[in-house]
């Protein structure tokens, strides 16, 4: 391209691209039915969803960069699934309730020959306490995958083809905890929130892929934190808000494995502090400021692609919100 009179104009035509010379299209439709039944302290919810996806990949190859159609490889794929679900909520008292459910999970495959859809059965159950200024939740979950899909991403150590591959049987389970409170002193409200998630993952079959290499039964799924916690501390007074956020992520694997984590295949745990403030000048104008990684902590977020990737350094962002 060349600049002429302040505008960019084509100068020397280049050759058409020859890498990933393909077009992929999908046609999908879905429908669902939902029913809710309430009687006394009980609320039951049941439903079902139907998904139908047809895919077609047309690969014109490097020999036909202009996509004339003389050389073309077509790869179709199709997936359809019924996805039932059931949930319940029962109030033990005006503040305490139990909840749970079981649902079928689904994700469509890519336009790859013999590629299977992702399907799973997801269970959850727990308790919730809720009052005017206090809310506490404790939820356990377990996802049983009959077939999990993985993606060939550079960010996950693959070749970056974006193609999906069959992982097979896997399990993901854990627990979540949430606590929220809004104590008030005079005219100042102090919103507080604490969350914690524990996640355990496990491969239940063996396979090999370009992205993950050799995977064995019992290996953990990469790039999933086993421990993650977040705390939010705030103060609100009329049109002014001040918030401090504390983030903790435990160590995680960057390739499938089990047992002790090798240093070369681990993202170490890290603790980050963020802050934000908001001032409402009038009914139309609000000013905001956000500080990310206030302590300028040095931490890692990935080992892919092509080596270590650092987390966000200290950053300061300001803005204005206008409403009319």
Q: Where are these predicted regions, by residue range?
A:
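C-terminal beta-signal and adjacent terminal beta-strands/loops
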Residues: 146, 190-191, 248-257, 278-324
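Extracellular loop and loop/strand-boundary signature of outer-membrane beta-barrel proteins
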Residues: 14-22, 63-75, 109-123, 160-166, ...
